[in-house]
Amino acid sequence: MDSWLLSLLIAGVVFAIFQLRTVGQRPAGCPPGPPTLPIIGNLHQIPNKNTHVQFKKWADEYGPVYSLVLGTTIMIVLSSDAAIKDLTRGVESTHRAQICISVPWQAAGFAWSLCDTWRQFRKLFHSFTHLGAAKSYVPYQDLESTSMMVSLLDNPDLVFDHIRRFTTSLSTQMIYGFRTPRTDDPMLLQMYDGFEKWSTLIGAGPAKLLDVFPVLRSLPAAIRPLYSHALALQKKKSELSFGLWQDAKRKVEDKTSKPCFCVGLVQAQAEEGLTDHVAGMIASSALEAGSDTTASTLTGFLQAMVLYPAAQKSAQASIDRACADRFPTIADMDNPETQYIHACVKESLRWMPTTILGVPHAVTVDDEYMGYRIPKGAGVVYNVWAVHMDPRRYPNPRAFDPTRYMQDLASSAESAQNSDVSQRDHFAFGAGRRICVGMHVVDRSMFLVIARLMWAFDISKAVDVDGDDFVGGILVRPRPFPVKITPRSESRAAKVREAWAACQVLLDQGQQWKQVPEGMPFTTYTGGD
């Protein structure tokens, strides 16, 4: 071998060894964190289950801003309200971190970066969910929550299926223009199966390796079975998303659609040149955002009612003062007597935050905070659990105690805009420019369901329940548990059935809306405004 070639080879090996020596080390100036090991950094310390518990322990030890070294990746963990507010200013950390395994699930990453498609999605979805638009969906929320109540009378053992059907049917009606009237609907089952498989997959050890060692992504597919599995899941998701979009688009063009998000999306496609692929994924993302997380939060509320019967009695007394023997309606939101119900909504979102560690974001420019260096490309995680379990913000934080919000009259959106972040109600909807724009819809849906549940039913435990037993990965929910749901009285059960009977005149034989609900606009899309 020529001496120059040998020298080049030796130099390459030395350089590679030198580079490997730095992998797994915490860069100078970064926030503190647990000790690292060569190559893997802190990867071995990240538990596969109950990650939020360990992240909270590290926050207690290292402070509100700490760092984790995950192979070649730096993760900055924000564990206080002030840190989350300060580090979500402007555009510095608004890109979503690209999680390798989730890229195919997210349609090759379209939703993960601050790009034109993301801006289009935000603009479209805001026009669809702002306060004025949210109020127009009351007929949908009223019918779906009434359907859920009568289903609980008929089949109380399927309570968690009824919750999922409620949130899914409300979402498909608002987004695509059709109801999902059955708990065994194939689309519903496929969607939630995909949610669960993806959430489990993204938290798996091999998936983490692909994230923290990008070089592994170039390995042959045959030795990356997890990534191939993700591609297979994405293929099923794309087929479902594209089919739902094409059907909704056809109905809009045929003028047979009901008012929904896709009416505006068809207009936006023509005006802004969106492809069918992008339009379908935008609609699908809206569906996912509106169904799974709300279902998990409502499941958490049920669990809280089992664990904290005194809170249930207070909620029932609140709605009884407001409604007496009248079936609750959305108008009861404005009744001062229902403040405890509003407090239950806020406390449910605090006590059971489904995005328990937020959604990973990425810093787009070098930054500095509290004297620490925040390097460009670092992942940023909002440690929502740590903030929600901070006893300085919420005394006795693991207790479900709606009274902590009895003086809080602000909506979620109003609270998120409060310049004093210490007064914000919770961080379940995120922060910064990526905050959930569907807050108005969620607040109203949860109020109506909780008010009607508390008015119509007693909720009690069938067996002992562990309030800290969660399942899932990126998105979590309480592990399913036996619960006993019984009508508070025969007269109230009859009132529920009367309300559902009144809804039947609105529906055809397929349980779809016969006509456009009175006063509901076909679209709230405002074009390029």
UniProtKB/Swiss-Prot annotation:
Species the sequence originates in: Humicola fuscoatra
Subcellular location(s) per record: Membrane
One cellular-component annotation, GO: membrane
Protein name in UniProt: Cytochrome P450 monooxygenase fsoB
The EC number(s) this enzyme carries: 1.-.-.-
Main location, first listed in the record: membrane
GO molecular function: heme binding; iron ion binding; monooxygenase activity; oxidoreductase activity, acting on paired donors, with incorporation or reduction of molecular oxygen
Top-level EC class: oxidoreductase
InterPro entries noted in UniProt: Cyt_P450, Cyt_P450_CS, Cyt_P450_E_grp-I, Cyt_P450_sf, Cytochrome_P450_fung
PROSITE patterns (UniProt xref): CYTOCHROME_P450
Membrane topology: Single-pass membrane protein
PANTHER family per record: CYTOCHROME P450 MONOOXYGENASE ALNH-RELATED, P450, PUTATIVE (EUROFUNG)-RELATED-RELATED
Keyword entries, A-Z: Heme, Iron, Membrane, Metal-binding, Monooxygenase, Oxidoreductase, Transmembrane, Transmembrane helix
Needed cofactors: heme
Function, in words: Cytochrome P450 monooxygenase; part of the gene cluster that mediates the biosynthesis of the enfumafungin-type antibiotic fuscoatroside. Four enzymes are sufficient to produce fuscoatroside: the terpene cyclase-glycosyl transferase fusion protein fsoAthe cytochrome P450 monoxygenases fsoD and fsoE, and the acetyltransferase fsoF; the cytochrome P450 monooxygenase fsoB and the glucose oxidase-like protein fsoC do not seem to play a role in biosynthesis of fuscoatroside.
Transmembrane regions: 4-24
Membrane recorded as keyword: yes
Similarity comment: family membership: Belongs to the cytochrome P450 family.
